[in-house]
Design a protein with these regions (language model features):
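Gly/Pro/Ser/Thr-rich low-complexity, intrinsically disordered segments predominantly at protein N-termini
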Residues: 1-228
Length: 228
């Protein structure tokens, strides 16, 4: 998915450079400055503002289109109800600040397994890496969702990542896979269309028709079944 250079390749390139020490020193100074900027961002951020801190910059989000909002609401109905019914964990839509390395994100939907939330404080503002994240594409966010966020989510152990295209009505499902002598990597489980069925691997036994993500009537039908 991402075209970003591999971490090992970047490290090798720096260490092979004759002024590697100067590059590292300059990077350290930049990261110290960025950390101060990030602290100011967190103090400035309020519940009424949707913004993220990505690679040293504050990224503001404009109001979403109706189709984006409908998809987000449909997903929250399904995943929120399923997680509560089976006591699986915590679900957040849009406003949970996620700390991943140097960046702070507010995913469209995030889920944490119950055992990871038992000692959470009700006043906490900054959250650890979720077990499951969903991002809904828009023109302004699609590059970040497919590249910067993809790399961050993968490298910080997010177990499952869905990228949803609300215009094409498609869901791309990525699952974190462990391999011997290698870092965990996302693998594409499949791209699912409106007439297909999708199985969530993190929320055990959740099998949903993709139509329930995009269509209000199909969503209501599926949610009604979940309540039985």
């Amino acid at each position: 998915m991402s075209n970003s250079p591999k971490q090992d390749d970047l490290f090798h390139d720096i260490m092979e450079h004759p002024i590697a020490d100067q590059i590292i020193e300059r990077a350290n100074q930049a990261m110290e400055k960025e950390a101060r900027h990030r602290a100011n961002f967190r103090e400035w951020l309020t519940p009424s503002v949707k913004a993220e801190f990505i690679n040293g910059e504050i990224v503001m989000h404009s109001p979403v289109k109706r189709r984006h909002l409908r998809v987000a609401e449909n997903l929250h109905y399904i995943i929120g109800l399923y997680a509560r019914k089976h006591n699986l964990g915590e679900v957040s839509i849009e406003k949970a600040l996620i700390e991943l390395g140097r960046n702070d994100y507010e995913p469209d939907l995030a889920f944490w397994l119950k055992e990871r939330t038992l000692e959470w404080d009700n006043d906490m503002m900054v959250h650890p890496a979720p077990d499951f994240i969903i991002e809904i594409l828009s023109e302004s966010t699609k590059d970040r969702d497919r590249n910067t966020k993809y790399v961050s989510y993968e490298s910080h152990g997010v177990g499952e990542y869905w990228i949803i295209d609300p215009v094409k009505e498609l869901v791309e499902q990525f699952v974190l896979v462990s391999k011997p002598n290698s870092k965990d990597k996302f693998e594409l489980q499949g791209t699912f269309g409106i007439d297909e069925v999708l199985t969530c691997l993190v929320l055990k036994d959740l099998v949903l028709p993709v139509a329930a993500i995009f269509d209000a009537q199909e969503n209501m039908k599926f949610v009604t079944e979940l309540t039985k």
